[in-house]
Amino acid sequence: MKLHEYQARDLLARFGIPVTGGGVAVTPVEARTIAAEIGGPVVVKAQVHVGGRGKAGGVKLAQTPTEAEQVARQILGMNIKGLTVEKVLVAEAVSYKRELYLSAILDRGSKRVMMIASAEGGVEIEEVAKTNPDAIIKIPAHPTMGLLDFQARELAFRIGLNDGKQARQFAQIASALYRAFVECDASLVEINPLVVKADGSLLALDSKILLDESALFRHPDLAALHDPSAEPEAERRAREAGITYIKLDGNIGCMVNGAGLAMATMDVIKLSGGEPANFLDIGGGAGKEKVKAALQIILSDPNVKAVLFNIFGGITRVDEVARGIIAALEEVPTDVPMVARLVGTNEEAGRALLAESKLIPAATLAEGAQKAVAAARGEL
């Protein structure tokens, strides 16, 4: 589960990490009030779960409370990558000398919490990994004792914080970040940038936190932070229908039963020269209504040029899936070509149901992927 920036900021503050002052506004007048309380220049930031807010005009500087009100009026209601801005964070504008990066993430290779730091903050860490990988410092926390003091100090020294006072403060922040990661059952806690102010002190200027949804039952206070309005409409509908759906950037929609088979399907589409438009797992035992909902979600993406059904009927009955596809197509007529690879329980009945439809049959996954790629290109 993603947290908004203001929620992440407040959570880090609970662990003793220095953060910017400010507050959240849902109206321009509230933004003006918060700016007046700060008493200086402020940054008004759109609170939506997407990157690229600044480039989209969702982050603006305001010198006065009146200007903060004007800026908030411009940002509130703005559409950024399909999400409507309903809240803005009004935070104090801070001058600084350096931008650093610090995060904690679960490293599945070492099966430990990996602490990552870099002297090149303020930009996407993935970009730093491409352009200057040596600037990224990684240290795994001890599996039972956590992040040790000497490890935190080593991170500080290796990113150029040679001043003793700065190194100690960085070590304290790194240790607090690790505690936040573990105690909140997070999958990512990131400060980017962690800035060095003019007086030499450190401050978390922007932050990102991802929580493990499977562990939220242990944290009702964190679960309460979930904002349904901040997630894309398709993902919200999928969650309500009990479907696992993640939108991607391709043009071939996928409906698969089982997460492993869904990932394999995406891989084969890529190997066939195509790009998957989504990850979608309808789960085991999916009935007609669930299949219908899944297809409607896939077709709601205007980028989808073809759909590939890859169903292996173990618990899931192939004829039930076929009925769901037919029912969905009756309610949502579409010209999008569809390829179906249906095998397993009641597959003969399922294929018979689809025989009179316009679906393109495929005997194997490889054949299905190749036909879906060709259909997306308009070659079928």
Curated annotation (Swiss-Prot):
Q: What is this protein called?
A: Succinate--CoA ligase [ADP-forming] subunit beta
Q: Which family does the entry's similarity section mention? A: Belongs to the succinate/malate CoA ligase beta subunit family.
Q: What's the stated role of this polypeptide?
A: Succinyl-CoA synthetase functions in the citric acid cycle (TCA), coupling the hydrolysis of succinyl-CoA to the synthesis of either ATP or GTP and thus represents the only step of substrate-level phosphorylation in the TCA. The beta subunit provides nucleotide specificity of the enzyme and binds the substrate succinate, while the binding sites for coenzyme A and phosphate are found in the alpha subunit.
Lineage of the species this protein comes from:
Bacteria, Bacillati, Chloroflexota, Chloroflexia, Chloroflexales
List, alphabetically, the InterPro entries matched. ATP-grasp, ATP-grasp_succ-CoA_synth-type, ATP_grasp_subdomain_1, Succ-CoA_synthase_bsu_CS, SUCC_ACL_C, Succ_CoA_ligase-like_bsu, Succinyl-CoA_synth-like
Binding-site positions, Mg(2+): N192, D206
| Enzyme nomenclature, EC number | 6.2.1.5
Q: Quaternary structure per UniProt?
A: Heterotetramer of two alpha and two beta subunits.
